[in-house]
């Protein structure tokens, strides 16, 4: 099965969305060296380890019920840009410490024809606004990112930490901070990427 077809079958993409993912892949390949975005640049890696990996978040959270999302340390736009493609009404804020990556993402926004995306050149712990949902992918240790991001999440809001197979140790080491900052772990979602390309663990927390 071709990788675009894999996305279409799994996530019920329409032709316009499929075209947006194709543009995303091509633009990422074109600009990657200039902006030093990702080492995973092959067709299989981009579609499976970036696009697919981002979209499986829709299986743990109904983004139709979410108004605004903050993606911390988005890098090349993952996971928020793939989610924005299939949920065009989402309001996205990117908090990114690399100005170079923000410049790439601003261009990508135009290429994909996306709207309602804001960019903040700042570290997460310095940002002061709050959101319905905060997303973090491969940014650092769980206890640290929980502390950095807690104030960004509204009351009864959600926090998603995208982790790998070693999540259990990080989760164990984070119990004290989870209790201290008044968050509950409400879901652990394990997913296998296509073609045995890896295991993803997505942790869903809610504030109280």
Swiss-Prot record:
Annotated coiled-coil segments of the chain: none
Pfam families: GidB
UniProt keywords, alphabetically: Cytoplasm, Methyltransferase, rRNA processing, S-adenosyl-L-methionine, Transferase
EC number(s) stated in the UniProt entry for this protein: 2.1.1.-
Secreted found in the keyword field: no
Family: Belongs to the methyltransferase superfamily. RNA methyltransferase RsmG family.
Described function: Specifically methylates the N7 position of a guanine in 16S rRNA.
Protein name as it appears in the record: Ribosomal RNA small subunit methyltransferase G
Organism for this UniProt entry: Phytoplasma australiense
Gene name as annotated: rsmG
């Amino acid at each position: 099965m071709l990788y675009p077809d894999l996305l279409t079958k799994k996530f019920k993409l329409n032709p316009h969305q499929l075209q947006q993912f194709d543009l995303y892949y091509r633009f990422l390949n074109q600009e990657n060296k200039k902006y030093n975005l990702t080492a995973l640049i092959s067709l299989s890696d981009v579609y499976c380890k970036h696009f697919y990996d981002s979209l499986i978040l829709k299986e743990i959270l109904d983004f139709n019920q979410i108004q605004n999302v903050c993606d911390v340390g988005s890098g090349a736009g993952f996971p928020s840009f793939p989610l924005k493609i299939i949920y065009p009404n989402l309001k996205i804020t990117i908090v990114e410490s690399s100005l170079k990556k923000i410049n790439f993402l601003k261009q990508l926004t135009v290429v994909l024809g996306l709207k309602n995306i804001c960019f903040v050149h700042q570290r997460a712990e310095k940002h002061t606004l709050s959101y319905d949902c905060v997303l973090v992918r491969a940014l650092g240790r769980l206890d640290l990112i929980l502390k950095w991001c807690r104030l960004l999440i509204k009351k009864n809001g959600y926090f998603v930490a995208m982790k790998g197979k070693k999540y259990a140790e990080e989760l164990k080491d984070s119990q004290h901070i989870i209790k201290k900052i008044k968050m509950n772990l409400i879901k652990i979602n394990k997913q296998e990427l296509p073609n045995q390309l890896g295991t993803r663990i997505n942790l869903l927390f809610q504030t109280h």
